[in-house]
């Protein structure tokens, strides 16, 4: 008799995705981040649900409700810090996952890659709106500065900003709608992640060598379920260590001050995972130009498949492109550092140089190095 695991309509879907899924036998730990991102999403939804039970999305009580969660709710401090630091872990996994996709040529699976880019944008939007909810100084001013960027859109800009605000400034209406969207978006992300997985399983995973793995596949379970548990252990160890020992390591001290529209903080900056994009935004003196550069810093991922000039899928055997890739990683770290610095000399010049390098490497230097490598292969 055939196992119900293979015949039951619901069990069959799970079985084909996580148990009997044919998986390349040589994929490394870099392929672990998909399951880690799924874990992060589950952690975020669970902790977020418990936080929403005690949080009040009102300008008069939001800040004190977060203080109440931290002080009075049983393990409220832990739920809150798991949620806040869980977001950091989520973005670390996201960046590593995207980096793996770039390095090993996973962007050639167009549908999977484009859904992944949409997932990244949706996650960034969710994190931004979540940062506004505690209603501290950085919450308020971050929301004001970032939403105000839309006023750079010609003709409809200022109307659009007021429509998003629900008034003439960031206020009660803004906080309420941000809470609404912050609550609903993770479920949309979960749905998009399912579609992401669906498209991935149409083609199957790539592998480090970049050549077809059709002749050599193994079932996902027990091989990769066991392997993924190791990565999961490290993720949970890092998250719990951060939460229990240094919960405020990645947060801004300004956010422990109640939002005050009459007092601007000296340095308005977002959470660390947005600093690279924020640095690109600030490096352009023109407002509209900055907004376009900010959007392109993420949307450029969608044009990467079109700039793929190499005869090989993976970068594993392409030393010139590898140099370009690691230069891009160093450039992103530089941008992250610059995003947290004040707008003054020499940070302005470093930020502008790093921003130019970011787009130059992705759009020009990586395709160029691929063409050189193609030429060298003929020799």
Swiss-Prot record:
Pfam families listed in its UniProt record: Cytochrom_B_C, Cytochrome_B
Essential cofactor(s): heme b
GO-annotated molecular function: metal ion binding; ubiquinol-cytochrome-c reductase activity
Annotated residues for binding of heme b b562: 83, 182
Chief subcellular location: mitochondrion
Tagged with keyword Nucleus: no
GO cellular component, as recorded: mitochondrial inner membrane; respiratory chain complex III
Membrane spanning stretches: 33-53, 77-98, 113-133, 178-198, 226-246, 288-308, 320-340, 347-367
Record-linked Gene3D superfamilies: Cytochrome Bc1 Complex, Chain C
Biological process according to GO: mitochondrial electron transport, ubiquinol to cytochrome c
Binding-site positions, heme b b566: 97, 196
Coiled coil location: none
Cofactor remark from the record: Binds 2 heme b groups non-covalently.
Membrane disposition: Multi-pass membrane protein
Keywords associated with the record: Electron transport, Heme, Iron, Membrane, Metal-binding, Mitochondrion, Mitochondrion inner membrane, Respiratory chain, Transmembrane, Transmembrane helix, Transport, Ubiquinone
Highest taxon above the source species: Eukaryota
InterPro entries: Cyt_b/b6_C, Cyt_b/b6_C_sf, Cyt_b/b6_N, Cytb/b6-like_sf, Cytochrome_b, Cytochrome_b_C_euk/bac, Cytochrome_b_N_euk/bac, Di-haem_cyt_TM
Protein localization: Mitochondrion inner membrane
Binding site for a ubiquinone: 201
Function noted in UniProt: Component of the ubiquinol-cytochrome c reductase complex (complex III or cytochrome b-c1 complex) that is part of the mitochondrial respiratory chain. The b-c1 complex mediates electron transfer from ubiquinol to cytochrome c. Contributes to the generation of a proton gradient across the mitochondrial membrane that is then used for ATP synthesis.
Other information: Heme 1 (or BL or b562) is low-potential and absorbs at about 562 nm, and heme 2 (or BH or b566) is high-potential and absorbs at about 566 nm.
Assembly, per entry: The cytochrome bc1 complex contains 11 subunits: 3 respiratory subunits (MT-CYB, CYC1 and UQCRFS1), 2 core proteins (UQCRC1 and UQCRC2) and 6 low-molecular weight proteins (UQCRH/QCR6, UQCRB/QCR7, UQCRQ/QCR8, UQCR10/QCR9, UQCR11/QCR10 and a cleavage product of UQCRFS1). This cytochrome bc1 complex then forms a dimer.
Family of the protein in this entry: Belongs to the cytochrome b family.
Listed name of the protein: Cytochrome b
Origin species: Callithrix jacchus (White-tufted-ear marmoset)
């Amino acid at each position: 008799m055939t196992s119900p695991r293979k015949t039951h309509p619901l069990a069959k879907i799970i079985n084909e995705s996580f148990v009997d899924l044919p998986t390349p036998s040589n994929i490394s730990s870099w392929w672990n981040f998909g399951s880690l991102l799924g874990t992060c999403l589950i952690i975020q939804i669970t902790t977020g649900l418990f936080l929403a039970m005690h949080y009040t999305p009102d300008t008069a009580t939001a800040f004190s409700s977060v203080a109440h969660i931290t002080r009075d709710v049983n393990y409220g401090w832990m739920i809150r810090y798991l949620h806040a630091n869980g977001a950091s872990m989520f973005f670390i996994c996201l960046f590593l996952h995207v980096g793996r996709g770039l390095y090993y040529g996973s962007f050639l699976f167009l549908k999977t890659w484009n859904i992944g880019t949409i997932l990244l944008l949706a996650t960034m939007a969710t994190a931004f709106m979540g940062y506004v909810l505690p209603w501290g100084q950085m919450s308020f001013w971050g929301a004001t500065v970032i939403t105000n960027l839309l006023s750079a859109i010609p003709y409809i800009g200022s109307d659009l900003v007021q429509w998003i605000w629900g008034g003439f400034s960031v206020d009660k209406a803004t906080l309420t709608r941000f809470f609404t969207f912050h609550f609903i978006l993770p479920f949309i992300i979960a749905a998009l992640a399912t579609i992401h997985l669906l498209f991935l399983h149409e083609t199957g995973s790539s592998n480090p060598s970049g050549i077809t793995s059709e002749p050599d596949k193994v079932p996902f379970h027990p091989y990769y379920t066991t392997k993924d548990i190791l990565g999961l252990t490290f993720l949970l160890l890092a998250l719990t260590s951060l939460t229990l020992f240094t919960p405020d390591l990645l947060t801004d001290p300004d956010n422990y001050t109640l939002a005050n529209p009459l007092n601007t903080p000296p340095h308005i900056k977002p959470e660390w995972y947005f600093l690279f994009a924020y640095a690109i935004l600030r490096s352009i003196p023109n407002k509209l130009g900055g907004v376009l550069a900010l959007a392109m810093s993420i949307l450029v991922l969608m044009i990467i498949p079109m700039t793929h000039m190499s005869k090989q899928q993976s970068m594993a055997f392409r030393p010139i492109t590898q140099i370009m890739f690691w230069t891009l990683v160093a450039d992103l770290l530089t941008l992250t550092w610059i995003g947290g610095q004040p707008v003054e000399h020499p940070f302005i010049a470093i930020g502008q140089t790093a921003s130019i390098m970011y787009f130059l490497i992705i759009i020009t230097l990586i395709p160029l190095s691929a063409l050189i490598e193609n030429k060298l292969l003929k020799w």
